[in-house]
């Protein structure tokens, strides 16, 4: 509900207008590829400038790893729910079962993506680094990192005596993550999509 209210207020506050389903498809494509995260609006792959004044696509790649890693983990949880409630199959599942494969790949991608984003933020020039927001950024990145990392550790230790303690730590991080999710840096993805949707609609209206 918090996501919906925030997104609706943002949409109205910017004066954006619905551009139709073709514009929606354009915005979805831009979101999936993150082509705008390439240094300019053309998405030509120039990359974003780093502290050494050289352009790099590292931020786009780490965003990709984080976004798709999260989606794979979400798919893993959804698949596990279907297995449990619809198919009557209780966890733990085999290492080659779909929920485990999706969660493992997604967890690794999340670890790589969040660690990379943290590295990129550390390398940013102080003049362009929003110091007032770094606390929120770092907190979100590290919580997401440890959620995925403890999930991978849980998988590795699930047949040992440490499984119970690891599960408690992992679930505690997961619950905390979802509790603060509507008020964290995560929402910038929704606002970014809203901006892309408004831009796609405006572009199509201008082309008519």
Which role fits each region the language model picked out?
Residues 1-208:
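Membrane-embedded alpha-helical bundles of multi-pass integral membrane proteins
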């Amino acid at each position: 509900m918090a996501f919906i209210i925030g997104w609706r207020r943002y949409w109205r506050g910017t004066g954006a207008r619905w551009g139709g389903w073709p514009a929606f498809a354009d915005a979805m494509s831009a979101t999936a590829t993150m082509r705008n995260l390439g240094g300019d609006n053309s998405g030509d792959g120039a990359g974003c400038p780093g502290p050494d004044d050289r352009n790099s696509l590292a931020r786009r790649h780490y965003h990709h790893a984080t976004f798709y890693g999260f989606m794979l983990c979400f798919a893993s949880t959804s698949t596990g729910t279907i297995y449990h409630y619809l198919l009557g199959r209780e966890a733990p599942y085999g290492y080659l079962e779909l929920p485990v494969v999706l969660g493992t790949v997604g967890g690794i991608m999340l670890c790589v993506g969040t660690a990379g984003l943290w590295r990129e933020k550390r390398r940013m020039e102080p003049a362009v680094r929003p110091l007032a927001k770094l606390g929120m950024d770092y907190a979100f990145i590290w919580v997401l990192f440890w959620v995925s990392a403890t999930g991978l550790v849980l998988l590795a230790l699930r047949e040992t005596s440490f499984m119970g303690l690891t599960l408690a730590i992992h679930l505690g991080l997961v619950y905390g993550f979802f509790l603060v999710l509507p008020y964290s840096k995560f929402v910038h993805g929704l606002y970014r999509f809203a901006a892309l949707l408004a831009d796609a609609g405006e572009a199509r209206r201008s082309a008519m």
